[in-house]
Structures are given as structure tokens and as C-alpha cells.
Amino acid sequence: MDGKPQDIAAVHYWGKTRPAWHLLPCHCLDVAATGREYLLRHHRLRRCLAAALGLPEPVFLAWFTFFLALHDLGKFAQSFQARRTDVLLRLQPGLGAPTKTSPERHDSLGYGFWNEHLRPRLRNGD
């Protein structure tokens, strides 16, 4: 890898396709930044949510932003990406036409990935 954007695996996935496709990592970061900015401007809401969770506001804001960035984690699933093969093949030209699709929603796919792969690693300190 020589540091070019195309060498980063995450840039080969789409997050939105209308009006034009938008890279999934960019979409996730856009949502996280927007949500963070919203809470920074709404002090009372931020204070209330942090207090309800028993967290200091800066800690709550950091976790909130982190989870917003993960909100579309399930869209990395090949079965989701295959819903728009035209965009997928443009981003991953060597892939060939994907045949695996799933009726499962991307939120369920992301939650499954979180529970099966990420959460256990956090528990183990990986």
C-alpha cells in the first residue's frame, strides 16, 4: 500500500446512492459530525442525556459521536452493497457481479456484526 485513497478498503463501499453515490465512511462521519454539532448547540438536551446515563458531558458526547459513526455499520455487508450492483461494481471493479443479497436490513446486519465481532473484543480488551 502506497497511501493512495484507493488502497483503503473502506472507500470501496457506498453509503447513499441518491442523488449520487456517497462513500460509506464519508456518510458515517458526516452523520457523526452533524449529531455532535447538534448536541454542542443544544446544551440542555446534552446535559439531560448525559445525566440520564450518569456520564460527564464530554464523555457522553464522545460516546454519542462514536456510536453515530457506527450507525450504518451493516452497510459494509456484501449483501447490502449488492442492492446497487451498478455502484458496487464501480467501486469494486474486480469483484464481478455479486449474487448474494439478503432481505435483512442494514441496521440488523450492523447490530449482528457488533454483537458477534466488536463487542466481544471490547470485553476482552483487544
Predicted regions mapped to residue ranges:
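Metal-dependent phosphohydrolase cores
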Residues: 1-126
